[in-house]
């Protein structure tokens, strides 16, 4: 049994959306009948809302986007429900915001709900709750959401369906010398691609940059990621059965556990701690906790046990973790504590994730 997370982008749901969804439903149903479990992350609510409201283009204000999403979401779910019912299968709507996942208990509740739906043989259909998401707590795109969902449910495979056939060394639409990339054994090696990966089209928000970011999140959690051409819905059945195509991002050999994945990718840092070189070496090479004596400066205002960014002396991100003290306590103690033996722990190693492992 394979647990799949499948992500459908907005660009794939243009035109005759009902017929397109019926085509994808056949592939999803075939995998579920075979004994696999599938979670679907779908875009399309805003686009369908724009169609229903006869808008000439995607809105450019938050309020208008949220209103379009609210209009289109019910219609989107009705299409999936009808399409899967033909195959005798049920669907469940799950709308998420980042705030649902930032809280550890709610994160576990969301994971448990999805696991129960899968155990019942139901297809969870997930979308960001665009009608309610605030700007500072948005996933921003469903590529990121699909990667976080894959980590939360312990998926084996994440399939990102898009309107290109694979990853290229540069944009093949503008560069005739662009080379296809079929396998990526560590997505961080492709950071240089992100600068030219491109933004989403007129109706979408997820260009290749967000797909590379999603691949890094998922592979860090032990999930194999497939980037494949989804423009022909009939291809989905074969892709879920193991057909090679597109680009495969292989999982990290030492994947993060559930909690560390949550720390690294879900939490939004509320402040920063700047570290000296000795503290950086202790974290990187000795697996130590961060002591206050290794902190040179604190930025931002945050309460105790909230997520913070850790920066090395060059200002580069070293990692993330939960700070045991609030920002004022850290500031007050910086001028007092100079002895490592008397220095309190400000980020315990069990609540710390390094950027490059």
Swiss-Prot record:
Query: Which positions bind ATP?
Result: 7, 162-163, 205-211
Q: What does this protein do?
A: Catalyzes the transfer of a phosphate group to glutamate to form L-glutamate 5-phosphate.
Q: Which GO terms describe its molecular function?
A: ATP binding; glutamate 5-kinase activity; RNA binding
Query: What positions does the entry give for substrate binding?
Result: 43, 130, 142
HAMAP family (alphabetical):
ProB (MF_00456)
Subcellular location(s) per record: Cytoplasm
- Keyword Calcium assigned to the entry: answer is no
Q: Where is the PUA domain?
A: 270-341
Pfam families xref list: AA_kinase (PF00696), PUA (PF01472)
Can the keyword Electron transport be found in this entry's annotation? no
Lineage top rank: taxon: Bacteria
Protein name as annotated: Glutamate 5-kinase
Regions annotated as coiled coil:
none
Concerning its family, UniProt says:
Belongs to the glutamate 5-kinase family.
């Amino acid at each position: 049994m394979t647990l799949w997370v499948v992500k459908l982008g907005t660009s794939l749901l243009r035109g005759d959306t009902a017929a397109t969804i019926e085509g994808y439903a056949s592939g999803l149903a075939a995998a579920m009948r075979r004994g696999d479990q599938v979670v679907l992350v779908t875009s399309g609510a805003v686009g369908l809302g724009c169609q229903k409201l006869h808008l000439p283009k995607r809105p450019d204000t938050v309020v208008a986007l949220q209103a379009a999403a609210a209009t289109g979401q019910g219609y989107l779910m009705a299409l999936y429900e009808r399409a899967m019912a033909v195959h005798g299968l049920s669907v469940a709507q799950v709308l998420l915001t980042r705030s649902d996942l930032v809280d550890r208990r709610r994160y576990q509740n969301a994971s448990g709900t999805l696991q129960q739906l899968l155990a019942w043989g139901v297809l969870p259909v997930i979308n960001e709750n665009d009608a309610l998401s605030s700007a500072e707590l948005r996933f921003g795109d469903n590529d990121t959401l699909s990667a976080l969902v894959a980590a939360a449910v312990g998926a084996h495979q994440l399939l990102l369906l898009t309107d290109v056939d694979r990853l290229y060394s540069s944009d093949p639409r503008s560069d005739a010398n662009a080379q296809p990339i079929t396998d990526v054994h560590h997505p961080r090696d492709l950071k240089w691609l992100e600068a030219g990966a491109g933004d989403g089209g007129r109706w979408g928000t997820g260009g290749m940059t967000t797909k590379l970011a999603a691949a890094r999140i998922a592979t860090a959690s032990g999930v194999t990621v497939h980037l494949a051409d989804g423009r022909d819905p009939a291809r989905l059945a074969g892709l879920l059965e193991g057909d090679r195509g597109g680009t495969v991002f292989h999982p990290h050999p030492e994947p993060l556990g559930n909690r560390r994945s949550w720390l690294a990718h879900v939490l939004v840092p509320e402040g920063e701690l700047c570290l000296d070189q000795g503290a950086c070496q202790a974290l990187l090479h000795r697996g130590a906790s961060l002591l206050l004596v290794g902190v040179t400066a604190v930025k931002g205002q945050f309460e105790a046990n909230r997520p913070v960014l850790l920066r090395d002396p060059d200002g580069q991100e070293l990692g993330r973790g939960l700070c045991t003290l609030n920002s004022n306590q850290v500031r007050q103690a910086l001028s007092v504590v100079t002895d490592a033996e008397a220095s309190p722990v400000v980020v315990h190693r069990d609540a710390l994730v390094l950027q490059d492992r």
